[in-house]
Structures are given as C-alpha cells and as structure tokens.
Amino acid sequence: VLCLTSSTDPRWAAIAVDDFATTLADHAHCEMKAATNALSLATRWPATPRVARALTDVAEEELRHFREVMALLEARGIELGRPESDLYAAELRRAVNLTSDKTPHGSLADRLLVGALIEARSCERFRLLADALAARGDALAPFYEDLFACEARHYTTMVDLAIEVRGEAPQVRARLAELARVEGEIAARFGVRPTIHG
C-alpha cells in the first residue's frame, strides 16, 4: 500500500475485529493525534502559508473523523479511556531524528514524511478492517472504506508538501523510501495487537 515496505500480519484484522471496542477506542485517539500533529506542524512553520493552510485542512478532516469515531463509541456504549503511549509513532520519530539533516526545511520535510508514513499505515489497516467487517456483515465496513480513501489522500498531501518545502522531489522520494524501510521494521516489531498502528 502506497510506500509501505512491509504488510500487516494477516492475523491482525481478525484480532482487531474480535476486540473491536479496543480497536475503536485506539482509532479515536489516533484521529485526535493526527489532527494535533497537523496543527502543530502548521504553527511551527508559519513562513510557509500554503503548507500551513493544507495542514489545517488535514487537521479539520482528522478532527471530523475523531467526532465520527466518538459517536460510534457512544452508540456502542464503549468508553474512550486514556490513550496508551504510541510507541510506534515515537520510535518512528526517534529513528528519523537520528538521521535528519537538522536544517529547518529538512526537519519540516522529515516531519511531513513521518506523517505520510503514519497515514500510509492507517490506510492499509483501514482497508483490512473494511474487508474484515464486510466479511462479517458489519455495517461499519463502508465507513472504513471511506477512511481508507481519506488516509490515502492525506498521505499524498504530506508527500507533496514535503516536496514543496524541500524543493527537491528526487531527494524527498529517496528519503521517503529510506524512512519507509525503517517504518516497516518498526511496524513488524509490534505484532498483532488490536490497535491501528502498533
């Protein structure tokens, strides 16, 4: 899917659907974190207004998804609870920081590429969830199909913004491929828990 170098373990979807309360609560937290991250990036680099506007649009869409997932939790009588530490995202950011060129544009481009990779993994997982839910006749399958398309669009937005910030498409694509290999190794270490990423 997109730039990913590893596929999710085939057992994950069944585990996620079997413990859907946990998966759905984790999904809500992921949407809020995605919105927060997009806004954080938009406000840290105000010198690039088009980038800030695009990231604000992403944040608004992620916040809408958060509201939708919260409504699903409420309808199913599931408590959101506190978020668990997102070790997947933390490890990915740590690995990127070790190899970043540390210039303002390089740092922003890397943060955007990390966002793109997280969107790509979400995209893959939502496709798997949509298929698994459809196989069980669950009415939420179309919801996850729609999210699959949204996450794919966010992935493209993040990559395009990284290219715009950096101004060097071949270098950005090479960096994305490098970071995608790291993401694949990190994702593989987390096994098959009923969470969206790790």
Task: Go through each PLM region and give its residues.
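Non-heme di-metal
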Residues: 1-198
